[in-house]
Amino acid sequence: MLRQFLVSTAVRRVVVPSMAQTRCASNLDKSEYTTPGEIVDYDDPPHIPVPEYPSRPDEPLETRKQRLLYQSRKRGMLENDLLLSTFVAKYLKSFTADQTAQYDDLINGVSNDWDIFYWATETKPTPPEFDTEIMRLLKEHVKNAEKVQRIRQPDL
């Protein structure tokens, strides 16, 4: 039994280090870890139905603003949670009814949150139907000319 243990230990000393050299990420060429030059973003197949967001024409303005505040904080994607919650904390209170409707259409009319992120960061061009006053304001907010740290959502 001791002899078998010693043989297996000797084999481990010979085999395992040679395997570890090929599998260890620190031994690989660093050029393999470059950032891709373009974003891989496939269109959704046409057979996947995307439900329409129901419009709420009779919703009072203050109720709509409260709903948008909540929806801006709970996107399911941290990047948009941070961008939209800080945007709403800064601008939503001063929005008119028309601006509030534009913002509602922006965050609820798009079926993919990555689209909002790419448009706001100007990684992809914004479609004309979403290129509104509010989207331009959001793009300016994302540029962060004031250099404000946005590492967490603002308090309610």
From Swiss-Prot:
A GO CC annotation given for this chain: mitochondrial matrix
One GO BP: mitochondrial electron transport, succinate to ubiquinone
Keyword Chaperone tagged: yes
Region (Disordered): 35-62
Classification via Gene3D superfamilies: Flavinator of succinate dehydrogenase (1.10.150.250)
Record has Mitochondrion as a keyword: yes
Family annotation (Pfam families): Sdh5
Protein name per Swiss-Prot or TrEMBL: Succinate dehydrogenase assembly factor 2-A, mitochondrial
Classification lineage: Eukaryota, Metazoa, Ecdysozoa, Arthropoda, Hexapoda
